[in-house]
Design a protein with these regions (language model features):
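Surface-exposed binding/hinge segments that line
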Residues: 119, 155-199, 222
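Extracytoplasmic/peripheral linker and loop segments enriched in polar/acidic and small residues
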Residues: 407-412, 416-418, 447-520
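Long beta-strand-rich cores associated with HINT superfamily self-processing modules
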Residues: 516-542
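Extracellular/periplasmic solute-recognition and catalytic clefts
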Residues: 154, 163-166, 221-232, 249-308, ...
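Gly/Pro-rich hinge or "lid" segments in bacterial periplasmic/extracellular proteins
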Residues: 93-94, 98, 188-243, 247, ...
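Structural transition elements
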Residues: 335, 339-372, 389-392, 484
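N-terminal lobe/hinge region of extracytoplasmic solute-binding protein
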Residues: 59-111, 142, 213-214
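N-terminal secretory signal peptides
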Residues: 1-15, 22-31
Length: 542
């Protein structure tokens, strides 16, 4: 089994490459990366001795060959790495998502204001030694807000942020379209990048391919796609999250067995690993490791091609959800570390409300809906990503659909293969994949706009955006974004999620917990995340 990228929305990172004419560039490192690289390094290096100067080795269960462009990426590995390399004006705590001053000197006193002014941290430098200026801030936000440039970050900002103005070399002003307090925590998604580097011809292609020059506590020293990425503490960093490790070596090991082996035993080759298989928790704990989970928006979802009959019929989509034995899936595949979806949002989300349509296992209702829709003799090929826990869940889906008379074929494939087909607009019936918008934040408005919207990439995949119900939904989503009253906004969100649940075009089957393992004798300050990747900005040697 292979874990290519746990967060399939992450997976669609490659889809954005087509907008820059760089599809496929993420598989190779640009030659210009050598300017900030130290050359090949053994993936087996663990520091060459003890002491505080030894290398921290981490095992990441996702590929490092996705887009590294902070304005585009949703790759688990790359986003986690970028959080150590780059800074936003503000950044957020990885668990609570409380904002703190990063490149800016303070958090705005009034989140409800329609202008936010920021002063840049004095003496802040990029990893090439050049100073961070207001021009760099404007450069990044201009890209994000450019109507002619399609980026993932655009969906997080364009609805509420009008423009970003330079006041002088050290000061900028953000002008909002309307009061939007949630925007404060979203500023971490706009990582400030050096204009003098990435405005050059081919600069964004280089960023996609792995070139990373930020102002954060760690400098990227080497990048080997599908192998490892290395870092070292940046000596000129003068911000609030100073590096505790002199060097770091992050290995990408997408196969579950070798990933577990690398962190196991007395001679383990790593101190921390994410994406721990549920079946290995006891083994690792027995070996003295701490294994902890984070529950959030991680989910297995089904996505239907609404232009492929009979999946244009909402009754068919609902029937397929009702048919799935989620209890068995959670018991057998997830070893109890999951819950059936009772809303698009997970139960712990502050905006959660049980949806009006909840797809409890009901094969009789599923059969009745198919009969009502006039569907019989249905044959379905499930196009799935081969993330290991998704692969573990697929047999339950097949058995459940077979049980109501559907001839079901499983077709798990490399993530890139699945979403290349989506980008090429190839025909398909249903996709089973994984998603976790908590990588970007916790607020429901962000989560829902990540998955739904008139220009949203997922909606292009579903071929549903021009549906009259979809158009009404998108208007309600925009109304919620603009609603200044928090409780009214919450109600609007909950009401439109009822529509999302009823239509089941792209909808979760289960929400599941993610597991991280580390050696508590060597590391302290680790907190398990409810989304893929790791954050070591507050960790240190024990």
């Amino acid at each position: 089994m292979r874990d290519v990228t746990h967060d399939v929305p992450a997976l669609h990172r490659r889809s954005f490459l087509k907008y820059t004419g760089a599809l496929g560039a993420a598989a190779a490192v640009s030659a210009s990366l050598s300017a900030c690289s130290s050359g090949p390094q053994s993936t087996n290096e663990t520091g060459g001795g003890g002491g505080r100067n030894r290398t921290l080795t981490a095992v990441i269960g996702y590929g490092n060959d996705g887009s590294w462009d902070p304005t585009q990426t949703a790759s688990a590995f790359c986003m986690a790495a970028n959080n150590h390399i780059y800074e936003g004006l503000l950044d957020t705590d990885p668990i609570s998502r409380e904002p703190y001053a990063a490149l800016a000197t303070q958090v705005p006193a009034d989140p409800s204001a329609t202008t936010w002014k920021f002063t840049l941290r004095a003496g802040a430098k990029f990893h090439d030694g050049k100073p961070v200026t207001a021009d760099d801030v404007v450069f990044v936000f201009d890209r994000i807000l450019d109507p002619k440039t399609q980026t993932l970050a655009k969906g997080f900002f364009a609805s509420w942020l009008k423009e970003v103005r330079k006041i002088d070399a050290q000061n900028v002003e953000l002008v909002l379209k309307f009061p939007f307090p949630d925007g404060i925590s979203r500023l971490t998604l706009a990582k400030i990048m050096p204009k003098h580097v990435f405005s050059q011809p081919g600069g964004w292609e280089d960023a996609i391919a792995g070139k990373a020059i930020g102002s954060g506590p760690y400098r990227q020293t080497a990048h080997h796609p599908k192998s490892n990425t290395t870092f070292e503490a940046y000596p000129d960093y003068n911000g609030p999250r100073r590096a505790a490790f002199k060097k770091m070596n992050w290995l990408t090991i997408v196969d579950a067995a070798p990933r577990v082996a690398r962190i196991s035993g007395a001679s383990a080759g790593a101190q921390i690993a994410d994406n721990i298989p549920y079946a290995n928790i006891g083994q690792l704990e027995g070996g003295g490791l701490t294994v902890a989970g984070g529950a959030g928006m991680n989910n297995l979802f089904l996505m239907f091609n609404t232009k492929h009959k009979p999946f244009d019929d909402v009754r068919v989509r609902q029937a397929l959800h009702y048919a799935i034995d989620t209890g068995k899936m959670i018991e057998v595949a997830l070893k109890g570390h999951g819950k059936p979806a009772s809303s698009f949002l997970n139960e712990a989300n502050p905006s959660y409300r049980r949806a009006k349509s909840v797809y409890d296992h009901d094969p009789d209702k599923a059969k009745a809906l198919l009969k009502e829709a006039g569907v019989s003799g249905l044959k379905i090929e499930i196009l799935a990503v081969n993330v290991s826990w998704i692969v573990d869940c697929l047999p339950t889906i097949k058995a459940s659909w077979d049980a109501i008379g559907i001839k079901t074929t499983l077709s798990p494939q490399e993530t890139t293969a699945v979403f290349t087909k989506m980008d090429q607009k190839q025909d398909y019936q249903v996709v089973a994949a994984a998603s976790n918008p908590n990588q970007f934040g916790l607020d429901a408005d962000l989560i829902m706009h990540y998955n739904y919207g008139p220009e949203n990439l997922w909606m292009q995949y579903t071929r549903w955006a021009d549906n009259s119900i979809a158009k009404a939904l998108f208007k309600d989503m925009d109304r919620a974004t603009r609603e200044p009253d928090a409780e009214k906004k919450k109600t609007i969100v909950q009401d439109y999620i009822d529509v999302v649940a009823e239509q089941a075009v792209l909808y979760p089957v289960v929400h599941n917990e993610l597991m991280t393992a580390w050696n508590p004798q060597q590391l302290t300050g680790i907190r398990a995340q409810p989304y893929p990747g790791i954050n070591l900005l507050q960790a240190k040697w024990a």
